[in-house]
Amino acid sequence: MEWSEPAIVLSVAAFGESDLRTIVLAETHGAWHGLARGGAGRRGAPIWQEGNLINARWVARLPEQLGSISGELVHPAAAIAMADPLALAVLRAACAVAAGALPEREAHRGAFIRLARLLGGIGIAGTALPALVRFELELLRELGYGLDLSSCALSGAAEDLAFVSPRTGRAVARGAAGDWVPRLLKLPAFLLDEDAADDKADLAACRDGLALTGHFLARDAFGARHAPLPTARLDLYDRLTRRLNGDDDAR
């Protein structure tokens, strides 16, 4: 059995002296494990970096086997992100969330496209964080935990949506929130406009977006697996909080 198609490197782990056990995300094959022989060597290391887009080829004698995976580098997102600590933190968080939440060998085309879009623009200032929030929303939707941000759960209004119920995942209008505001999750405005430029979202709105998706990822996507949110995702949120509080070391 074998397949070949573009894929995103989600995770790599040492396996022996020079091989790597990898997880990639392919558009039609989903999250897929494989053994990259020589992946830790001089030629393989630049390819097998989390976040890179590759042309992957997986081969095994039987479908249930781990199999061997090889790849050709298409887009070096990991190397590009190295120039910006925040972009690198976003890349690592996105890959960790995808690797931990997506079931193995199950296609999730929307999540793949969103993640590929995030990684393709990882070097464009100001776009990575909003793209991560949009990716996580799509991931939740594809896993069956989608949020309803179309109208207010209380009034039915489609205007002035500002919050989300942490219980139902439905939007709530500012005027209808009343005394419930302290219990609701903030809904950043950039999520209400699919065509909004991601580089216009400020840092506080991005943190609100990550708090929103993080709540439902932890409760539903990872909660269903009895697993915590990945450390890389928790670290990113902490970095944003410290940066908003004026900590220059969190940049």
UniProtKB/Swiss-Prot annotation:
Disulfide bonds, which pairs?
Answer: none
Gene Ontology cellular component annotations, sorted alphabetically: bacterial nucleoid
Q: Signal sequence span per UniProt? A: none
Which residues are in coiled coils?
Answer: none
Keyword Flavoprotein assigned to the entry: answer is no
Which BP terms does GO give this entry? DNA recombination; double-strand break repair
Give the matching SUPFAM superfamilies.
ArfGap/RecO-like zinc finger
Its keywords, alphabetically, are: DNA damage, DNA recombination, DNA repair
Transport as a keyword of this entry, yes or no, is no
Q: Which family does it belong to?
A: Belongs to the RecO family.
Q: What does this protein do?
A: Involved in DNA repair and RecF pathway recombination.
Q: What is this protein called?
A: DNA repair protein RecO
Species whose genome carries this gene: Acidiphilium cryptum (strain JF-5)
Its lineage opens with: Bacteria, Pseudomonadati, Pseudomonadota, Alphaproteobacteria, Acetobacterales
